[in-house]
Amino acid sequence: GVSDKTVLTYNRHFHSLGYHLDMTMTFDELTKEALDSMLVSLRKSGVSSNTISSYARVFRTFLKWCRAEGYTDLSLPNIQDKETVKGSYTDEELIALLRKPAKDCDFCEYRNWVIVNFLINSGCRAGTIRNIQNRDVSLSDKRVIYRHTKTGKLQSVPLCSQMAKILSEYMSIRGGAPEDYLFCTVYGEMMSENALSCAIKKYN
């Protein structure tokens, strides 16, 4: 099976493709020309190459299932993502980013600083960091357990000494029960994915 988030992504992709392909047509009516026209329409609409590649990947998976079930013989070519160079932080920017905020900063700014440090140290996914609970952090062993992973399996990850020190101080301020979320809102609740994204952008 796939995660709820993956299913939601598939639904969104198919909804977007519906503007470029008649989703009401039967398999008998679906042709290679129709698929080619869909790709041409996507390109003309100004959709980025990487987005088209993502849409095509989902639709190709759907067609693969349809072929296995005997509904169609059609397939969609593999569209490569257009390589883009992502900017990285300079040493000066990284030092400024990781500089600890002033002691009189509010909880959100302090929490965001800890989150940025954690992400740089671990590189974990947004869904993973949002689901970490206080009890998942073992400061004595310098390890953290990821409950929410892409594979659905628990994962134990080591912490560097500096990150363990940062978390130790943060957790003494954050407090809360073992089952509470480590990186929470000011009300002690789980941060939404959008809230986490906005918090990181605002801190940057």
Residue map of PLM features:
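Conserved catalytic core of the tyrosine transesterase superfamily
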Residues: 1-204
